């Protein structure tokens, strides 16, 4: 396909126009008095949101250069969302401010490479100052506050997220589901749960609840199909002699092996339940390994030289209780070695850090939660489908925001932390003139989030920035009330990770804008004009 090329100032200004259009739609959502944006969908009802990355993803511009500029700023929002789960609007506002200042200086003759270097040095100092300002989350109320802010000031969402995190811990998984009822509900899962139920309903022990409950069972974990009773019989006899029930987790249990377990259960000779192993392929192998570590068993597999017919009780795991329904299995208080469990948790954390796939990261996070924490499900309901989707999205954002706060701590919110950190830009900075100009650009850009919050609240941005600059450190504008307060005491807080990521990603993309000297884009296809109708153009009957 033919290409078109723009150079120097024309190229940069084309990118800037695209950035301005995207940033204009995103930044109106910043702060407690930020507005919503309605997004048209090809199918179904429109979406209403105040989430920066959701808005950015929907924007596609017609002009090829503007489209590229918008795509570059989209990356700021996406990257910030991936790393920290929030701060996408702040990142977009910072990027726009840095690019405006930078292009003005490049047009005036400044060296773009030196400006970029100055930006990088300043950002490094600001991130260090943010770390100094950061405070650990000490109370459940602080978790509720930071989650509420991310959820657009909805305190009910903040409270339920704080409750969920209190129950499942730092590494626990909090999922959000749509509910048919109004309001919010919290459902907690005790122990490790995976989504495979009993193979046969004959294993049920509680007819009323349609579940099988085993107290203090042995647990067999096998990455094989079990169909021959002669393979299983030696182990069954040993378990029967021990007088305990048995949970069998295998690739499949079928044929005479399944029939033997069912017949003995019905006759009351021996209590057991068979379930299929969760997952497929390599993921199944990993999840069986997790179950084995949690319960203190070994995975019976020919790959590691272990055969079922030779298995002893030493290879089986234990748990205080197992509950199996038709859809899932829950293992409560597995008897695995705490040291081995901690090692497995560290291994999964390391895999999460190295993974560059969102899907893989999500699955690893679920495995981590099953081992180290627990699973909490927040069920959200609303009056209409549009409101339900918007509310669910806000809760998901708030959960990630709260987790980021637990991870790296909190700083004063409302743009105050960046304003405070701007004082560190020139600390010990000895650089050439253009690099110093780059650092000054960062110092100015750090006031923009506060300025935009004030503008969205109907106030004069410049006046508010100067007022806050002259207040005691840590004090700022509560845009919801228009009063000046101690931000930490008022519960107006941001996760340090979110603020840091927003600045770093904004600076990165600004550097790319400034050092761009040519843009190559696809030539737009010419639209064919409709042919004039033949004849006199009269009506036809």
Curated annotation (Swiss-Prot):
<dbReference type="GO" id="GO:0005524">
    <property type="term" value="F:ATP binding"/>
</dbReference>
<feature type="binding site">
    <location>
        <begin position="29"/>
        <end position="32"/>
    </location>
    <ligand>
        <name>ATP</name>
    </ligand>
</feature>
<dbReference type="GO" id="GO:0051082">
    <property type="term" value="F:unfolded protein binding"/>
</dbReference>
<protein>
    <recommendedName>
        <fullName>Chaperonin GroEL 2</fullName>
        <ecNumber>5.6.1.7</ecNumber>
    </recommendedName>
</protein>
<keyword id="KW-0067">ATP-binding</keyword>
<feature type="binding site">
    <location>
        <begin position="478"/>
        <end position="480"/>
    </location>
    <ligand>
        <name>ATP</name>
    </ligand>
</feature>
<dbReference type="GO" id="GO:0016853">
    <property type="term" value="F:isomerase activity"/>
</dbReference>
<dbReference type="InterPro" id="IPR027409">
    <property type="entry name" value="GroEL-like_apical_dom_sf"/>
</dbReference>
<comment type="subunit">
    <text>Forms a cylinder of 14 subunits composed of two heptameric rings stacked back-to-back. Interacts with the co-chaperonin GroES.</text>
</comment>
<dbReference type="GO" id="GO:0042026">
    <property type="term" value="P:protein refolding"/>
</dbReference>
<dbReference type="Pfam" id="PF00118">
    <property type="entry name" value="Cpn60_TCP1"/>
</dbReference>
<dbReference type="InterPro" id="IPR027410">
    <property type="entry name" value="TCP-1-like_intermed_sf"/>
</dbReference>
<feature type="binding site">
    <location>
        <begin position="86"/>
        <end position="90"/>
    </location>
    <ligand>
        <name>ATP</name>
    </ligand>
</feature>
<dbReference type="InterPro" id="IPR018370">
    <property type="entry name" value="Chaperonin_Cpn60_CS"/>
</dbReference>
<keyword id="KW-0413">Isomerase</keyword>
<keyword id="KW-0963">Cytoplasm</keyword>
<comment type="function">
    <text>Together with its co-chaperonin GroES, plays an essential role in assisting protein folding. The GroEL-GroES system forms a nano-cage that allows encapsulation of the non-native substrate proteins and provides a physical environment optimized to promote and accelerate protein folding.</text>
</comment>
<keyword id="KW-0143">Chaperone</keyword>
<comment type="similarity">
    <text>Belongs to the chaperonin (HSP60) family.</text>
</comment>
<feature type="binding site">
    <location>
        <position position="494"/>
    </location>
    <ligand>
        <name>ATP</name>
    </ligand>
</feature>
<dbReference type="GO" id="GO:0005737">
    <property type="term" value="C:cytoplasm"/>
</dbReference>
<dbReference type="GO" id="GO:0140662">
    <property type="term" value="F:ATP-dependent protein folding chaperone"/>
</dbReference>
<dbReference type="InterPro" id="IPR002423">
    <property type="entry name" value="Cpn60/GroEL/TCP-1"/>
</dbReference>
<keyword id="KW-0547">Nucleotide-binding</keyword>
<feature type="binding site">
    <location>
        <position position="414"/>
    </location>
    <ligand>
        <name>ATP</name>
    </ligand>
</feature>
<dbReference type="InterPro" id="IPR001844">
    <property type="entry name" value="Cpn60/GroEL"/>
</dbReference>
<dbReference type="InterPro" id="IPR027413">
    <property type="entry name" value="GROEL-like_equatorial_sf"/>
</dbReference>
């Amino acid at each position: 396909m033919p290409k078109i090329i723009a150079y120097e100032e024309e190229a940069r200004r084309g990118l800037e126009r695209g950035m301005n259009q995207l940033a204009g739609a995103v930044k109106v959502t910043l702060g407690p008095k930020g507005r919503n944006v309605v997004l048209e969908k090809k199918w179904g009802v429109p979406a209403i949101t105040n989430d920066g990355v959701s808005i950015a993803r929907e924007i596609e511009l017609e002009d090829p250069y503007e489209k590229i500029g918008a795509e570059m700023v989209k990356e700021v929002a996406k990257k910030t969302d991936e790393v920290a789960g929030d701060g996408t609007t702040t990142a977009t506002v910072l990027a726009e401010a840095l690019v405006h200042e930078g292009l003005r200086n490049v047009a005036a003759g400044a060296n773009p490479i030196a400006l970029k270097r100055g930006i990088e040095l300043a950002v490094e100092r600001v991130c260090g100052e943010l770390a100094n300002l950061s405070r650990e989350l000490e109370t459940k109320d602080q978790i509720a506050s930071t989650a509420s802010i991310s959820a657009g000031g909805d305190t009910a969402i903040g409270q339920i997220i704080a409750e969920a995190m209190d129950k499942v811990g730092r590494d626990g998984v909090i999922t959000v589901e749509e509910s048919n009822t109004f309001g919010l509900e919290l459902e907690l899962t005790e122990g490790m749960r995976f989504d495979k139920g009993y193979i046969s309903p004959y294993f049920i022990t509680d007819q009323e609840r349609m579940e099988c409950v085993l107290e203090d069972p042995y647990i067999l974990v096998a990455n094989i199909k079990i169909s021959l009773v002669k393979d299983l019989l030696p182990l069954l006899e040993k378990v029967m002699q021990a007088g305990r029930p048995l949970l069998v987790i295998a690739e499949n249990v079928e044929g005479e092996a399944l029939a033997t377990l069912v017949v003995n259960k019905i006759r009351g000779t021996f209590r057991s339940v068979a379930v299929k192993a969760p997952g497929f392929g390599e993921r199944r192998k990993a999840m069986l390994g997790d179950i084995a570590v949690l319960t203190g068993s070994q995975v019976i597999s020919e790959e590691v030289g272990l055969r079922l017919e030779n298995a002893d009780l030493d290879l089986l795991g234990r748990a205080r209780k197992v509950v199996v329904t038709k859809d899932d299995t829950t293992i409560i208080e597995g008897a695995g070695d705490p040291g081995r469990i901690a090692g497995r948790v560290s291994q999964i954390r390391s895999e999460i850090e190295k993974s560059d796939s969102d899907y893989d990261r999500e699955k690893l996070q679920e495995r981590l939660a099953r081992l180290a924490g627990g699973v909490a499900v927040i069920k959200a309901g609303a009056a209409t489908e549009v409101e339900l989707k918007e509310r669910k999205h806000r809760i998901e954002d708030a959960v990630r925001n709260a987790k980021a706060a637990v991870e790296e701590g909190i700083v004063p919110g409302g743009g105050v932390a960046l304003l405070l950190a701007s004082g560190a830009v020139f600390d010990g900075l000895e650089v050439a003139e253009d690099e110093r100009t780059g650092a000054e650009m960062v110092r100015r850009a750090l006031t923009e989030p506060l300025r935009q919050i004030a503008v969205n609240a109907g106030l004069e941005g410049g006046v508010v920035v100067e007022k806050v600059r002259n207040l005691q450190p840590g004090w700022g504008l509560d845009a919801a009330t228009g009063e000046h307060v101690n931000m930490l005491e008022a519960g107006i807080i941001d996760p340090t990770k979110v603020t840091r990521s927003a600045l770093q990603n904004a600076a990165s993309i600004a550097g790319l804008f400034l050092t761009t000297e040519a843009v190559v884009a696809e030539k737009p296809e010419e639209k064919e004009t409709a042919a004039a109708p033949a004849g006199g153009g009269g009506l036809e009957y």
